[in-house]
Amino acid sequence: MACSTSCSHAGATFTRTIASAMPASNMASQNWEDFNYPPLLNLWHYAPHELEQGPRFVARTLHAALLLAMLALVCNLLVNIGVVVAGFSHAIHIMYAFFNLLLATLIGMWTTMECGYKGMATNKPKLMRRYLWVWGLLTLAMAAASLLALINFNGWGRVASLLATPADPTVQTFWVVGSVIESSVWTLACVVSTVAWTMIFRANRDGPAALRWYAGSRR
């Protein structure tokens, strides 16, 4: 039995080593000194078209998760501005929403581009593990924002609370509609982020060979 276990472990290690070596040259061929993302700021290199089909699909999924999270934060800011202007909330919530957008965008971009995208494209487990930790926590935060009425976040709990509490019809309609939109975007961001997290988890666990599955799924 010990021999069988040892052989199995050796076989798995050999398979991962070979799989890692095969596509590594293609994925690492990008010019990482060509900083082109985000537009105008140019802090990171992002060129999914330079990757093979499987890694390209993963890269775009990671990017979609980032953009959806940013869109949810923009929705949160706009809803808070409307509610504050209507006199149903304190102006400080606008400041909270703005700083949430700024801070989360910076953390999200760094995590996605420097850790997830670069780690996957160059097959560096350290970067991918960093992405898994940080983006995993951010995904949990997105789930909370989509479900609860936390401080100035308008999740599905806010929708239920507003519908159960009589208020000025005009303001309530705006707040309910805004909360439904914000909650929906948070929910979608959470789902796509979970998919992106799973992709990087598989790439970190199984090596570049795991990315070929996504190429096959796109045919």
Regions found by a protein language model. Give the residues of each.
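Extended, low-complexity, polar regulatory segments
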Residues: 1-54
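Eukaryotic polytopic
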Residues: 55-82, 89-111, 115-219
